[in-house]
Amino acid sequence: MPRLLLVRHAEAAVQASGGDRERPLTARGWADAARLGVYLRESGLIPDAALTSPARRAQDTLAAILQELPPSRPFIAKVESSLYCADADTLLGLLPGPGQPIETLLIVG
């Protein structure tokens, strides 16, 4: 059965010189995201594909998670600009359709 994993970015800095999209993760954020990667690995929730917001904090969260996961079969990672401030309808529109070879999709926003 296909699975959808929705993850909010880890703790980010309050401000960044490049504005909201450029806020990096804090040290705690990196550690928390890595722990989530360990949890996913130990739970057998290994994604086939991942979508992430263009926000730096979301991309960093995904990077920290992926560092803790085993290399997967062909893995698809994509920055999806519509994820920045996305609503439920936007998320639904990003889901793979029938017949697409994605068993577990991870979305980080």
Indicate residue ranges for each PLM-predicted region.
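Short, hinge-like loop/turn segments at secondary-structure boundaries
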Residues: E68-L69, L95-P98
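Surface-exposed beta-strand edges and their flanking turn/coil or helix-capping segments
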Residues: G19-D20, W30, L92-L94, V108
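Generic beta-sheet signal
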Residues: L4, Q100-G109
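Short, flexible, glycine/charge-rich loop motifs used to bind or transfer phosphoryl groups or to couple energy/partner
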Residues: L40-R41, L94-P96
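Active-site-proximal alpha-helix that buttresses catalytic centers in soluble enzyme cores
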Residues: P2-S81
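Glycine-rich phosphate-binding loop signature in dinucleotide/nucleotide-binding domains
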Residues: S43-I46, P98-E103
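Short alpha-helix plus adjacent loop in nuclease-associated cores
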Residues: L83-L95
